[in-house]
């Protein structure tokens, strides 16, 4: 099992994730995504969007505002019910979520005893003000989830897109929660990104679609992101674990170095949200669906799929990371990312920094850069250049050598097994396209 310290070291060293405000000592639970991190996030987001919107004719996208009317959060139950139970250790002053520790045992931090304060409720929403006057009339919240922006746009999307039940609305965006404890690198933070889809169905079809989306989402992690199946599992919520809006819920959990934790939730939200907004807005017809064929009118039920984009980044790094002992006794660090997710698809290396080789290398770069994100490197030994690309997950390295001048062929070196092939320059584009399309992961890595 990979160690968390190895992932954190790689992430900072190679430019995936940096500590936010590091030059000023850092800000706990806040992280910046570097050149490779933004590419990995973008690629995961792209695959999610494709799987949700492009591969389903009845799902469309939305990008709702972070700031919304505070009445929305009162209607949704977040103002009154979106809270965690918090305790403090009276000896060391450490703060914990009450459901994360055993209050009958010693403090996890100081180990002195179980001298905790009584559990008290802590609302997770960030409150701020819009306008020049800071009073109750200008209060707004940073959204704690993207879902409510979808629900209040139910009628807008339904009418403008001419959709019929069942249909879905997908959204990727930032959410904010004033977590009692931020921990495990980018896993639990106050600012994060969600990939959510709300699927509206007839109440009688809720169970059928709930089962469909459970399997669909698990397949996404295994078949699209190529996450190891033996590190994924479903976990059902019992009645004591359900959120205030949910009738049923399943989590997809991944086995991180710190244990199995949620990466996506699939929830049967019933008609809770639409009914609440109909009530609080006093516009019930806006949230009602009229089936023109059957003449039936009803408030749709909702199935939610809610994945953490930032958690998916961490999961992908953990699952792809490997260390290999080579025959010469050296150690090779490899990120076995699916080529679709890799920040760079190709690295181009002139064997030596000679003009006759660099000119060809630059020409190949320009021919391919419209379709592939490419890293160009002409410094250092070829072995060290290979190792640098292995460590950031680049699947294919193309080397231009003196034979290239003679026969217009290059060496293509594959990341996972380090095999090399001579490929004609004119065939390079189609060769790499085919390799990416036919890529198969070895889950026994």
UniProtKB/Swiss-Prot annotation:
Gene (name only): glyQS
Entries under CDD domains matching the protein: GlyRS-like_core, GlyRS_anticodon
Reactions accelerated catalytically: tRNA(Gly) + glycine + ATP = glycyl-tRNA(Gly) + AMP + diphosphate
Family membership: Belongs to the class-II aminoacyl-tRNA synthetase family.
Name of the molecule in the record: Glycine--tRNA ligase
Source species of the chain: Borreliella burgdorferi (strain ZS7) (Borrelia burgdorferi)
Alphabetic keyword roster: Aminoacyl-tRNA synthetase, ATP-binding, Cytoplasm, Ligase, Nucleotide-binding, Protein biosynthesis
GO terms under cellular component: cytoplasm
PANTHER family associated with the record: DNA POLYMERASE SUBUNIT GAMMA-2, MITOCHONDRIAL, GLYCYL-TRNA SYNTHETASE/DNA POLYMERASE SUBUNIT GAMMA-2
InterPro entries for the chain: aa-tRNA-synt_IIb, aa-tRNA-synth_II, aa-tRNA-synth_II/BPL/LPL, Anticodon-bd, Anticodon-bd_dom_sf, Gly-tRNA_synthase/POLG2, Gly_tRNA_ligase_bac, GlyRS-like_core
Gene Ontology BP annotations: glycyl-tRNA aminoacylation
Binding site for substrate: 97, 145, 192-196, 304-308
Binding-site positions, ATP: 177-179, 187-192, 262-263, 308-311
Ligase in keyword set: yes
Cell location: Cytoplasm
Role summary: Catalyzes the attachment of glycine to tRNA(Gly).
């Amino acid at each position: 099992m990979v160690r968390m310290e190895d992932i954190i070291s790689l992430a900072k060293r190679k430019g995936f994730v940096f500590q936010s405000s590091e030059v000023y000592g850092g800000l706990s639970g806040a992280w910046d995504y570097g050149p490779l991190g933004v590419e990995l996030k973008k690629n995961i987001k792209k695959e999610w969007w494709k799987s949700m919107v492009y591969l389903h004719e009845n799902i469309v996208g939305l990008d709702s505002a972070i700031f919304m009317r505070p009445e929305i959060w009162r209607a949704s139950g977040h103002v009154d019910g979106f809270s965690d139970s918090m305790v403090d250790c009276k000896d060391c002053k450490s703060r914990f979520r009450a459901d994360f520790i055993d209050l009958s045992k010693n403090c996890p931090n100081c180990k002195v005893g179980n001298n905790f304060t009584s559990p008290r409720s802590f609302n997770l929403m960030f409150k701020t003000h819009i306008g020049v006057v800071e009073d109750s009339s200008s209060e707004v919240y940073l959204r704690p989830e993207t879902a409510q922006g979808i629900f209040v746009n139910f009628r807008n999307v339904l009418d403008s897109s001419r959709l019929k039940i069942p249909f879905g609305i997908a959204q990727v965006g930032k959410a904010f929660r004033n977590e009692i404890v931020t921990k495990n690198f980018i896993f639990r933070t106050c600012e994060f990104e969600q990939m959510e889809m709300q699927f509206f169905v007839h109440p009688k079809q809720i169970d059928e679609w709930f089962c469909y989306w459970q399997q669909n989402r698990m397949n996404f992690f295994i078949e699209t992101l190529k996450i190891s199946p033996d590190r994924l599992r479903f976990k059902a919520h019992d009645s004591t674990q359900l959120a205030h809006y949910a009738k049923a819920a399943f989590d997809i959990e991944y086995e991180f170095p710190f244990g199995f934790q949620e990466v996506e939730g699939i929830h049967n939200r019933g008609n809770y949200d639409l009914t609440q907004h109909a009530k609080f807005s006093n516009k019930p017809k806006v949230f009602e669906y009229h089936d023109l064929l059957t003449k039936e009118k009803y408030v749709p039920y909702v199935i939610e799929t809610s994945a953490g984009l930032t958690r998916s980044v961490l999961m992908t790094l953990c699952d792809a990371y490997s260390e290999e002992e080579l025959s010469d006794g050296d150690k090779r660090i490899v990120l076995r990312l699916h080529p679709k997710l890799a920040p760079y698809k190709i690295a181009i290396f002139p064997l030596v920094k000679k003009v006759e080789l660099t000119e060809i290398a630059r020409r190949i770069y320009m021919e391919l850069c419209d379709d592939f994100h490419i890293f160009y490197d002409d410094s250092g030994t070829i072995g060290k250049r290979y190792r640098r690309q292995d460590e950031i997950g680049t699947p294919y390295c193309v080397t231009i050598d003196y034979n290239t001048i003679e026969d217009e062929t290059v060496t293509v070196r594959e990341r996972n097994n380090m095999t090399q092939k001579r490929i004609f320059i004119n065939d390079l584009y189609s060769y790499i396209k085919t390799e990416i399309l036919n890529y198969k992961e070895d889950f026994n890595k």
